[in-house]
Amino acid sequence: MLDIAIIGCGVIGAAAAYELSHYPLQTAIFEAENDVADCTTKANSAILHAGYDPEPGTRMARLNVEGSALAKEICARLDVPYLQCGSLVLALSPAELAHLQKLYENGLANGVPGIRLLSAEETRAMEPGLSPEVAG
């Protein structure tokens, strides 16, 4: 008799099964495809959301930061290659620059590690092919 049935073995289903394997439960995964991670997970952008977008104090803000750290920990435990390369969020106008400032403040409040607000020059130094219109 099963205690837990997991529908789908994408990254979330596989992670749930992995975590549940640490408990004395009978768990099964039911996957419609011929292989694991062969649908939505296969088509994702492979970005872990850092937590700068959600409003501070929300569950999403907390889970983004905790989930990102947990993914890194699980990869290390399972000897899965993991590259934390960061991401750039660009602004092309003063209004977008103000929005970047808000995202930066959210990230600080949410405890996002390593978050920085770059000038236009710093941004183009990192990525020389960017438009000269990049404001930050």
Predicted regions span which residues?
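N-terminal Rossmann-like FAD-binding beta1-loop-alpha1 element of flavoenzymes
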Residues: 2-29
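Short N-terminal amphipathic alpha-helix/helix-capping patch enriched in small hydrophobics
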Residues: 16, 32, 44, 64-67
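Glycine-rich FAD pyrophosphate-binding loop
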Residues: 21-43
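Proline-centered flexible-loop/turn and helix-kink motifs
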Residues: 23-25, 76, 128
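Short clusters of hydrophobic/aromatic residues that line enzyme substrate/ligand-binding pockets
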Residues: 36, 48, 130
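Dinucleotide-binding Rossmann-like beta1-alpha1 core, especially the glycine-rich loop
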Residues: 46-126
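Short, intrinsically disordered, charge-balanced linker/junction segments flanking boundaries
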Residues: 132-136
